[in-house]
Amino acid sequence: MPQDRFVASDSIASRVQQLVDEINRHNRLYYDDAAPEITDLQYDQLLAELTQLENDHPDLRRPDSPTQLVGGDVVDQLVQVPHRVPMLSIDNTYSREELAAAMERIEKSLEGESVAWTMEYKIDGVAGSIRYENGELTLALTRGNGQVGDDITHNVRTIRELPRSIADAALAHPEVAGGNVPEVLEVRGELYMTDADLADLNVRQTDAGHEPFKNTRNVTAGTIRLLDPKIAASRNIRFFCHGSGELVGVRASDHMTFLQHVQALGIPIAPDVVRFENKEDALQAIAKLELEMPDLPFEIDGIVFKVDSFEQREKLGVRSKSPRWVIAYKFERYEAITTLEAIDVQVGKTGTITPVAYLTPVDIADTTVSRASLHNADEIERLDVRVGDTVVVEKAGKIIPKVVRVEKHARTKPLPKFEFPTHCPQCDEVLTRDEGGVYIRCTNPACPAQLRQRLVYFGSRTGMDIDGLGEEVVDLLLQKELVENYADLYRLNVDELAELTWPRLRKGKGDEMIEVQFGRKNAESLVAGINESRTRGLARVLSSISIRHIGPRVAKLITAKFWNLDLLRSAKAEDLAAIHEIGDRIAESLVKFIHSESGSQTLSDLDAVGVTMSETEPVATPDEEANLPLAGKNIVATGTLQHYTRDEIKARIEELGGRAASSVSKKTDFLIAGEKAGSKLTKAESLGVEVLSEDDFRLRYETEAT
């Protein structure tokens, strides 16, 4: 009899393991790949069997069990737990001058060493620390006071993007921990909610008769501290890793390598992290990030700069509340009080009807603000804002000013409510609400206001970056009926443009508007700018032609896998949704556009006029990068090379999976030495770093790569 009990126990343990693995596989198929293999009823039956077995045998309940993911036990209270490594805050600067001075001080502390910097968005969420022990997620904490945080493990387990176990991934990626499972991996990052998820949540709130949430940060902070994980599971809180706490058995000598390792383990990392060899390049890149901010799917309140090298971080050390190797350039929130003079509605490039507040001009953060966003009809209703009201206007993270509240005590007389239009103000099409009920749109593809906005965006710096194609020129081309779509721009010629006339203001006694010829010089400049944009590539095209939810970053992620027009047209929604960070909403929007009559025609027309509808080559995935010849290697090139320029050798090293460094150190795997190699060669030899000639490098690695 005792033997029978042991056999039964082994059999039950085996069945539990089988169910956990099987249900987790179905979760990935359903949530990540959008390709379920079983019905909801079959899934529920498997989950019910596992739940019953775990209730009967609690000792067999595994940390990665799907029963621990959603609908775990309600906790009685949040328990405070000490951080193994203090979770410090970041010092802030509020101007580029302050930022440059802070970075200069940091570099001076390293006494002349070359310093590489990383730059990333400062996501406006809630700081969190997530701990894996021997590959299993065991603990998640808030920052708290930096020394002690609240245990929010029950809620963090509901984040579907976050793996409960990293053991298999660690074994599959030996560069992370030498082929072992890390004893301790503690990732630090930001818990947050996207703008779209907040909009969806607020629809549910309103339908249930509850007040909508004001912003993503507040709802995130409240949600992760709830005692019932079922509520957290319903709100789609997400996580980005941007740093580390305690690490035991993890191989990484710098921040960028650490993030690559974390990503290989399936943990989401902060988006668009960029490494620069010096602070000057990093500071210059701020402008580019600011251009992309309005298209981000989440709120940010600054940009963070970090010393990349862990060795240099150790030298710099920490203060009582913050590390000395990181500094934030923060967008301070500025407010001002003014009067709402009028509300108008604008038609966007995808047909979205956006209400705009016209204000008595007021100075905010050295900028005169006379217009501000009111977002949508629901926001007008929530604020109960009316023409004539005294309002508070805020200018912060994403630059665009917005009305945040009404000073109702200053409303001394009755003011009429704003009536949102039922028809498009430009084409008189009946307006419709999205399925989610948040946005109101004009669905007329021939709406002239949409065409104008689409063409303006197409020519903008974040679009195809066409010099000379601004709002006035777009208005002129539309007025003269020279363009009806994007492809028409590429059919324009200098002669017909030069003969156009447009109204200009003549200064002088009694200013007046006169008709002035566009002229050959303007025409040649515009046509040259249009022609130059032909080779921007497929990612740039996709993000420029006003497809809903497809901005520059999303387009890059998609074209890394579907890198030409044929591949893109053959892609199914589930194929696109399987790409990390894409999801069903974006995938369905793109597929709908590609296979619609107007969308298909747009792509074909651009292809026909010679616009490049592909990327040079597909970008390697993290798995593919790990198999490249120089994966994980730090390489320095010095001296005059015969077959490469400085930029070409750097690009080639990176194409082969390596990291092109600017200075020699103990971390350097090898030095490529050309003629007149100089001091870097001397230093490499003194440190025992391997030295390759240019021919050695070509023979060893160019052959491997072909």
Curated annotation (Swiss-Prot):
Listed GO MF terms: DNA ligase (NAD+) activity; metal ion binding
EC number assigned by the record: 6.5.1.2
Stored SUPFAM superfamilies: BRCT domain (SSF52113), DNA ligase/mRNA capping enzyme, catalytic domain (SSF56091), Nucleic acid-binding proteins (SSF50249), RuvA domain 2-like (SSF47781)
GO annotation (BP), single: DNA replication
CDD domains for this protein: BRCT_DNA_ligase_like, LIGANc
BRCT domain boundaries: 625-706
Active site residues per record: 122
Protein's UniProt keywords contain Translocase: no
Family annotation (PROSITE patterns): BRCT (PS50172), DNA_LIGASE_N1 (PS01055), DNA_LIGASE_N2 (PS01056)
Keyword annotations of the record: DNA damage, DNA repair, DNA replication, Ligase, Magnesium, Manganese, Metal-binding, NAD, Zinc
Superkingdom classification of source: Bacteria
Positions bound to NAD(+): 40-44, 89-90, 120, 143, 190, 306, 330
Positions that bind Zn(2+): 424, 427, 442, 447
Presence of keyword NAD: yes
One GO term describing the cellular component: cytosol
Classification via InterPro entries: BRCT_dom, BRCT_dom_sf, DisA/LigA_HHH, DNA_ligase, DNA_ligase_AS, DNA_ligase_CS, DNAligase_adenylation, DNAligase_N
Pfam families: BRCT, DNA_ligase_aden, DNA_ligase_OB, DNA_ligase_ZBD, HHH_2
Assigned protein family: Belongs to the NAD-dependent DNA ligase family. LigA subfamily.
HAMAP family: DNA_ligase_A
Classification via PANTHER family: CHROMOSOME TRANSMISSION FIDELITY FACTOR 18, DNA LIGASE
The name this protein goes by in its record: DNA ligase
Native species: Rhodopirellula baltica (strain DSM 10527 / NCIMB 13988 / SH1)
